[in-house]
């Protein structure tokens, strides 16, 4: 009931309360109820009850008239009412008979009301509809069938509670009223109210009785609840069991990857040649792959796929010069027969060029006049390759397992917590084409080591096949093991154990740097003590390494007992600055020496310390290492050497030093100083890879640039400073001049001299003015002035509005002999002194546009020179400011290439670089510094407000200093060059378009480029799949043209080349998951050649050559695929003729062009 109704009823029971014959002695304090609105229909009754003290309200002064009245509250109100009635506060005019009748009537009404309440409660308590029951039963069956879920029972219990929790909304009205209850008028009002409640209850009873046929009994529902409980119990049991079993499987799961590879191929050619160079280049400039490619990409050697022939069963390298059709095919080879019965091999095109060794006579009765032509044809007829492999890889799946028990003297607990195990091994039939026999066990392919496929019969590379009489083919099954890694915890501190072949590890730059190829079989243990109390805040770490090499360790001892071992400890005391100490050793032990009694035990021992990281806003790197090498030769002296450097400089994640980013800054960007480099170093001459127990040595990365630097990403060397070479020419005939190779280059020898030096580079911003400078001096480790090289320079820049003015001065003085070319182009060796100054004014009006004017002057050995002969680039600190306003970066490099000079003569796409997506054309600009002046203008497409987004171009005109004669000390600016280049990369609709071009014309030789006019233009288009076109075709094409009119003393000649190609791929061809593609490519060139990689990291390249040859290489490539079943076919032709049209295949394939065809079907099933 609502409190308003009770209040009104109680007030009516007071009827004539105002007619009391006596008033209280003192009026009680009447509380004010704050939530009874004025004008409410019950307000007067509420106020009367409050004034009588029957209702006092809640402690917060509220009445809460809309809130249900509890039995406790009703009891208090009735008790107060009875107390007042007992005290004589009764209505006037009521007789005893009236009071008795009123009491009886109230009792009757109360009894009827109670009876109705009981009936309603019974019906509601058992009121579960059949529909509800059916739905619940269906859900029970679903839960049981699906294995159950905990949420299902909770949902059922909620519905049960909802159906059975219909409590009585009305309390039984009890009115145990004494004889002096109230007046007849109040009783009448109370009766009306009670009658209304009775009518409401009767309506509810009727509704419930009418729907009783749809209800089920409580007993049925209880039975249903029992079934729910049973299902829940079974589901919980099953879930617990499955959870444990699944967790165990996941912890111990191997990823098993069986595969079956089937291939059938036919390949034949009259002479092996390369076709990879026809295909479009990848985005990074590497040669695109195809089904017939051979060879691979190797940054150590510079090898690319275009360096190897692609036909037959052999990966023949292409050969430079006439014997290899100038780098387009493998070489011609002859067997030379001598009268004494011996033979020799001659690699050349014309037997007449062969020079007979002294004392030998050619036997003209054999072969063709003493020469036997070695057949260059390559055949691979109907070869079927079937490979089966089974790989096992945990990929970290072993987790949270425990070790087993063990021990011989005692039994271990077997409770070591293993966090992770990685295993990678497998079984395979046949061998990969690049497998080799690692004879010396150093983990690298060395010259003279046989290929694995050529050694093991039936492994895929030999013609012989093992069969039994039933016709079964037998192939060897090889076990492949890559690594095993275990990670486990000791206490709260993780321990990582790595076990495997060719272990890779790194202690420091000059000690135990074996993170590239690896050192040998063994294991490493790393302990992280970050959770150790007290010292854990310093992040202590300990690493231990142990293994064996089974081969050379650099101390001339091969074969037995060569082991390496080392330990390193490291902490991080402040910021990110780490401090480490280490000890390492490698050598042959006594047992190994016993296998070779002529040798004595030897060892290499090195130890040191290092600091790396940043603290207090300064980045610091420093290392010290000392090494003792005891050779294996008896009585040989122990060699001791040291390496040390301390450097404030920024280091990148790949451990290369970034001298363009300040290592420390003082002040702000407007007024401040930036320190880019500050270093001291001393590397002893004897400190090499043997002394450091490292994979590779610490020699200069390049002989002609950055001589002080050892860092080499091609070999993984991270050491910053080199063990320098002193170059000296040889003089075999004692004529006082250097010996020379056939091409005129100097024959030189190198002697290690170590390095000791100091360097600094800094810059400052002073509002609109920026200044910077650098200085470095280095000698051999002994400090001798004969090997000193010093580089120094300063720069300044003033910028305001859209104008900027830059000036720089650079010097390089080298007493250390340098190999370079003099003004006549002859290679010389000796000391060198270079001076250069430059000034440039730039205007950047916005929209990405720029225009500038410059003057530059270069002096070599005291004489003004056309170029710096490439000498300034042999230092490592030379720097200059960026052009434009708002960019005061003091960047390494003299920016000599900014104004050099259009199209180059070397490229890797065959047409001047315009079809190489990795070339931004400025790559064609030489880094040589010239004596010149000129103007240049252009547009930067990456500018935020660029006039044309993604369009880059520049044009320029320059006058170049030319000496009067090659040896003259005077000259003038009679040389001239006009140049330009452009590049536009843009997505146009569904097509990705790249348009590039360059040109230059000069009347004088510029470094390696002769006088003349050259230019190149290229277009590459690749479309997305055309979704609304049948077969969803995808088109791609390229065309590039290069031309050069070279004016040289030996005679002018024109070189030109055209490269073209077009293809289409049908992505949905007839059947789902079926694709087919076809492309045609060609390359035509005149007076162009290809020089293969040099083996020292330099890639092969195309260049101009006055060889009077016309080369034509073209062919068709078709590839189709259904799912993973791939069909490939190619047919290609290589022709090289002289300018009169005579084929240079004379004596080879009867003077006809070389032709090659290949067909391949391959299918790989991954089970």
UniProtKB/Swiss-Prot annotation:
Superkingdom of this protein's organism: Bacteria
Periplasmic side: 23-254, 404-416, 491-494, 529-540, 572-577, 616-617, 650-670, 767-768, 799-802, 844-848, 941-949, 989-990, 1024-1032, 1067-1073, 1123-1124, 1167
Membrane association type: Multi-pass membrane protein
Keywords attached to this entry: Cell outer membrane, Copper, Ion transport, Iron, Lipid-binding, Membrane, Porin, Signal, Transmembrane, Transmembrane beta strand, Transport
Positions bound to Cu(2+) 1: 274, 276, 305, 308, 310
Effect of a null allele: Deletion causes substantial alterations in cell envelope structure, and a significant defect in resistance to solvent and shear stresses. Mutants shed exterior layers of the cellular envelope. Deletion mutants show a significant decrease of the UV resistance, especially under desiccation conditions. Deletions mutants show large disruptions in the OM, but the S-layer is unchanged compared to wild-type cells.
Annotated residues for binding of deinoxanthin: 622
Domain SLH: 29-92
Signal peptide: 1-22
Membrane-spanning ranges: 255-268, 378-403, 417-428, 472-490, 495-500, 520-528, 541-549, 562-571, 578-588, 602-615, 618-630, 639-649, 671-682, 754-766, 769-779, 789-798, 803-814, 832-843, 849-860, 932-940, 950-960, 977-988, 991-1002, 1015-1023, 1033-1046, 1053-1066, 1074-1086, 1109-1122, 1125-1138, 1154-1166
Pfam family, one: SLH
Main location: other
Gene Ontology process terms (BP): monoatomic ion transport
Sequence ranges on the Extracellular membrane side: 269-377, 429-471, 501-519, 550-561, 589-601, 631-638, 683-753, 780-788, 815-831, 861-931, 961-976, 1003-1014, 1047-1052, 1087-1108, 1139-1153
Places the protein is found: Cell envelope; Cell outer membrane
Residues that bind Cu(2+) 3: 513, 515, 716
Catalyses which reaction(s): L-arginine(in) = L-arginine(out); L-lysine(in) = L-lysine(out); L-glutamate(out) = L-glutamate(in)
Residues noted as binding Cu(2+) 2 in the record, renumbered to the chain: 381, 549, 551, 553, 559
Note from the entry: D.radiodurans possesses an atypical cell envelope comprising an inner membrane, a large periplasmic space with a thick peptidoglycan (PG) layer, and an outer membrane (OM) covered by a surface layer (S-layer).
Comment, domains: The structure is characterized by a pore region with a massive beta-barrel organization which is embedded in the outer membrane and shows some protrusions into the S-layer, a stalk region consisting of a trimeric coiled coil, and a collar region at the base of the stalk.
Function statement: Plays an important role in the structural organization and integrity of the cell envelope, bridging the outer membrane to the peptidoglyan layer. Is a highly abundant molecule in the D.radiodurans cell envelope but is not a fundamental component of the S-layer. Binds the carotenoid deinoxanthin, a strong protective antioxidant specific of this bacterium, and could be part of the first lane of defense against UV radiation, especially under desiccation. Appears to be a nonselective channel.
Name by which UniProt lists this protein: Outer membrane protein SlpA
Species per Swiss-Prot/TrEMBL record: Deinococcus radiodurans (strain ATCC 13939 / DSM 20539 / JCM 16871 / CCUG 27074 / LMG 4051 / NBRC 15346 / NCIMB 9279 / VKM B-1422 / R1)
Top-level taxonomy: Bacteria, Thermotogati, Deinococcota, Deinococci, Deinococcales
Gene that produces this protein: slpA
